[in-house]
Amino acid sequence: MQRGEIWFAATPGGDRPVLVLTRDPVADRIGNVVVAALTRTVRGLVSELSLTPAEDGVPTECVVSFDNIHTVARTSLRHRVTTLSPARMARACRALDDALGC
């Protein structure tokens, strides 16, 4: 698993898509990874990153919500969907910075 990959993670409410944020050198070595949730609910916030099937390989138009960051067990990641391009990850980092405000 690598930073920038989108996976379906097993949650109590069913499988949900997430973007892996944990840095590459440790993502495969630790038990938990930091992820940001994907959602089809667009709020128009600077802390969101819009994704499309054509540009990003996601099944449907959605946003990564950097206001919804959490840690999940690495073993809960079930199925890799796609990997964001370096340019999209650069935008993701800007949205994450906006969300955290630091």
Stretches found by the model and what they are:
Residues 1-102:
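Conserved functional hotspots at enzyme active or ligand-binding sites that engage polyanionic ligands
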